Amino acid sequence: MGDSVLSAIQQTITQRKSANPSESYVAQLLHKGEDKILKKVIEEAGEVLMASKDKNPSHLVYEVADLWFHTMILLTHHDLKAEDVLDELARRQGLSGLVEKAARTES
């Protein structure tokens, strides 16, 4: 289910790249450029932190969804997709975090 939801959202965001900014929130963000998108990602990340401190699971889920959505817009701005992140996560699956970190510091 998760992949299909992310794929559908990704498809919509990608379509909004060519939409009229006066008719779409996503098109507005993409039209305004990277700095505006980054400000929104920072704002949403802060809201995730606050929701975590609130100890309210449903509020945390809501805010993480906002953060994911806005990072997907950022990815689209860079002609990347959520699938690229999922591929990276799949690559890391089964790797020890400590081993992976050590490999990064050696190179």
Swiss-Prot record:
One of its GO terms (molecular function) is ATP binding. It is an enzyme of class 3 (hydrolase). Its EC number is 3.6.1.31. It holds the Pfam family PRA-PH. Pathway: Amino-acid biosynthesis; L-histidine biosynthesis; L-histidine from 5-phospho-alpha-D-ribose 1-diphosphate: step 2/9. SUPFAM superfamilies: all-alpha NTP pyrophosphatases. It is found in: Cytoplasm. GO terms for cellular component: cytoplasm. InterPro entries: HisE, PRib-ATP_PPHydrolase-like. GO terms for biological process: L-histidine biosynthetic process. It catalyses: 1-(5-phospho-beta-D-ribosyl)-ATP + H2O = 1-(5-phospho-beta-D-ribosyl)-5'-AMP + diphosphate + H(+). Its main location: cytoplasm. CDD domains: NTP-PPase_HisIE_like. Signal peptide: none annotated. Keywords: Amino-acid biosynthesis, ATP-binding, Cytoplasm, Histidine biosynthesis, Hydrolase, Nucleotide-binding. Belongs to the PRA-PH family. NCBIfam families: histidine_hisI, PRK00400.1-3. This is Phosphoribosyl-ATP pyrophosphatase. It comes from Neisseria meningitidis serogroup B (strain ATCC BAA-335 / MC58). The gene is hisE.
